[in-house]
């Protein structure tokens, strides 16, 4: 399962994670975490990869299971599984290099959960339209009763998406998201440089 530009990493749970890695002699690697229902071939990861090549740092982009061309179905995934996908891949690739995490939307949630695991190697964090806890704060708490009933009874509901296909929100995704909430918990970023960017016209 391989193509010319990308490779696949197999996790301990046998999930096949597609990734692209640019190596560098510098002891720094930039790692991009994409958002929900996104992939690693969008404008943001490609732009950051181009910039990383220009300044000659390493760069890693990848797709969680159920996203892009990685294995499994999107509806089988959740924050715990996607965090584990990211952790196993990153842990196998960075060696002793310092890392800068860049998270887009849901990617920031997953990146923030991994900062403590890589704290000795963290050099910075950049969040773009960050959406930690979105399954609870932006979805479940704002869903009307009829939608909550559908999710509880059928296990899934397709939420309208102004950017493309509907978001398939599953009961297990909501339940798992509650276990992974971080916004109301103390988080030690270990004195990291942190930059957060959010568009004023972002309706989401």
Language-model features, listed with the residues they occupy:
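Gly/Ala-rich beta-loop-alpha elbow adjacent to hydrolase catalytic centers
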Residues: 103-111
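Hydrolase active-site cap/lid region
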Residues: 120-169
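Short beta-strand element of the alpha/beta-hydrolase
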Residues: 27-35
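Conserved alpha/beta-hydrolase
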Residues: 45, 49-71
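Catalytic nucleophile-loop/oxyanion-hole region of alpha/beta-hydrolase
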Residues: 67-94
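Short beta-strand/loop motif that positions the catalytic acidic residue
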Residues: 189-190, 196-198, 202
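N-terminal cap/lid segment of alpha/beta-hydrolase-fold proteins
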Residues: 1-24
